[in-house]
C-alpha cells in the first residue's frame, strides 16, 4: 500500500501552517510550535494519521467504493481533477453547489441535462439551431460541465470524500456529515477539524504538499481497486474449475 514518509512531507512543506493569528485552537494538539509567526505542524502526528487514512481509503476502494475528491480553490483545482481521473474516481473542483449531496435528486436532473446537451453537441443538433440558440446551449453545456463534469458518471452518492482544505470546503463536509458519508480531509492550522472523520493535519496551500496528498490517495485507490479485481478473478477461476 502507498505510504508517505516524514521526509516526503518535509520536502513538500506539509509542516508549514498558517500565520499564528489565524489559528483555530482546536488544532492545538497537532501544532509543534511557531516560527516567524507561522505555526509549524507536528509531522510526528501527521505521518501516522495520513497513513491510517490511506489504509481506510484502500479498504473502501477494494470494496468498489466511490471516492469523491473535493478541492475548489484555484491552487488545488487542476491537481484534484488529474488525481481523480488517474484512479477512475470523481471530483468537484470548481464550486461546491449547495445540496450537491443532500439534494442528489435535483443534481441528478442537472446531470441528465448535461448529458443531453453533450449528445446534442455531438450529433449535429447544435448545427441546426440559430447562432444565438446554439451559443446559449454551448454556454449552458460549459457551465454544467464545470460544475458537474467530475460527478456525471458517479451514479449515486459517494462512499467517501477526500477534501483539500477543510475550512474552504466546510459546506461539502457538513453535507457528508448529514448523510453519514466518511470525510477524509487535509486540515490546516486555521481550520476546524470537527466533522472530519479522518483528520490529516497539514499545509493546504502549497501545491507541492497538495500534490503529495493527491498522488498518494490516487495510488492507494488504484491499489485497492486492483485488489478487488484480483479477488473477482480468483472467484471466477474457482467457479470455472
Curated annotation (Swiss-Prot):
A GO CC term? cytosolic small ribosomal subunit
Gene3D superfamilies documented for this protein: Glucose-6-phosphate isomerase like protein, domain 1, Helix hairpin bin
InterPro entries under this entry?
Ribosomal_uS2, Ribosomal_uS2_bac/mit/plastid, Ribosomal_uS2_CS, Ribosomal_uS2_flav_dom_sf
Which keywords accompany this UniProt record?
Ribonucleoprotein, Ribosomal protein
- A Gene Ontology biological process term: translation
Q: Does the keyword Disulfide bond apply?
A: no
Q: Does the keyword Secreted apply?
A: no
Gene Ontology molecular function, alphabetical:
structural constituent of ribosome
Please state which protein family the record places this protein in: Belongs to the universal ribosomal protein uS2 family.
Put simply, this protein is called Small ribosomal subunit protein uS2
Organism, per UniProt?
Answer: Cronobacter sakazakii (strain ATCC BAA-894) (Enterobacter sakazakii)
Amino acid at each position: 500500500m502507498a505510504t508517505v514518509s516524514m521526509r516526503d512531507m518535509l520536502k513538500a512543506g506539509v509542516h508549514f501552517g498558517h500565520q499564528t493569528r489565524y489559528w483555530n485552537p482546536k488544532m492545538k494538539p497537532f501544532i509543534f510550535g511557531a516560527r516567524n509567526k507561522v505555526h509549524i505542524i507536528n509531522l510526528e502526528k501527521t505521518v501516522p494519521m495520513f497513513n491510517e487514512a490511506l489504509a481506510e481509503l484502500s479498504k473502501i476502494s477494494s470494496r468498489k467504493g466511490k471516492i469523491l475528491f473535493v478541492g475548489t480553490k484555484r491552487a488545488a483545482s487542476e491537481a484534484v481533477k488529474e488525481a481523480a481521473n488517474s484512479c477512475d474516481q470523481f471530483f468537484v473542483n470548481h464550486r461546491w453547489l449547495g445540496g450537491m449531496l443532500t439534494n442528489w435528486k435535483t443534481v441528478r436532473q442537472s446531470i441528465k441535462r448535461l448529458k443531453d446537451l453533450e449528445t446534442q453537441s455531438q450529433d449535429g443538433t447544435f448545427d441546426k439551431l440559430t447562432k444565438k440558440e446554439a451559443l446559449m446551449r454551448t454556454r449552458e453545456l460549459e457551465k454544467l460541465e464545470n460544475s458537474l463534469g467530475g460527478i456525471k458518471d458517479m451514479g449515486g452518492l459517494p462512499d467517501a470524500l477526500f477534501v483539500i482544505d477543510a475550512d474552504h470546503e466546510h459546506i461539502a463536509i457538513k453535507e457528508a456529515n448529514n448523510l453519514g458519508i466518511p470525510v477524509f480531509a487535509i486540515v490546516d492550522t486555521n481550520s476546524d477539524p470537527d466533522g472530519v472523520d479522518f483528520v490529516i493535519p497539514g499545509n493546504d496551500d502549497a501545491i507541492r504538499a497538495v500534490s503529495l496528498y493527491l498522488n498518494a490517495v490516487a495510488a492507494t485507490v488504484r491499489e485497492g481497486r486492483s485488489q478487488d479485481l484480483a479477488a473477482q478473478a480468483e472467484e471466477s477461476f474457482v467457479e470455472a474449475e
